[in-house]
Amino acid sequence: FLAARFGEWMSHKIYTFVSDGSIQEEISQGAGRVAGHLGLHNLIMFYDANNIQLSTKVDEVDTEDIEMKYKAWNWNVISINGNNAQEIYNALENANKETKRPTIIIGKTTMGIGCLDANGGSMESKVSTHGQPLSNAGVCIPSTIKNLGGNPEDPFVIFDEVKELYAKRKKELIDWAAKKKAEQAAWEKQNPELAEKLKTFFSGEAPKIDY
């Protein structure tokens, strides 16, 4: 919409994150059909498919084939192990190359992955871990932190490799933002009338309507 009116410098991706409950909502069905029909290729939706909802497991109440449904709606469908960082990265790379259709990345995930109870038993894929603090669901927080590779005595420590990763990414994003701002400034200088029109789009003011 924006790129068609104001140029390719406005071309960007829109990311949405949905859960099993979200994907079941009727409003999402209509939105999905429209997005596929219009070929909204700048839309990338990540679906956290953990088969858990508020009171039951999803497969107890729903037998839909989500992958086939979105394919029928003209979506680019990518199914991955949503607990695997490399698969997520690869899926996002592929989704950003799509130029004809919206993309849904179906990430098959495990609710409460790595969580343990006080006896060391697994709390993964438990309906009780949905919608409330894990401790209220019977998860032993210290045991879980240790199981996930952390230190229960210092649970909020930031590992050095994480600091390095985010510092590198921060630099990349600062450079990217500077480039986009320069593109915008050049476009505004060359297209003053459209630049004013764009400002009205984000001004929060209602358009004037001739009744």
Regions picked out by a protein language model, each given a short descriptive name:
Residues F1-K168:
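Glycine-rich ThDP/TPP pyrophosphate-binding loop and its adjacent helix/strand module
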Residues F1-Y15, K163-Y211:
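Thiamine diphosphate
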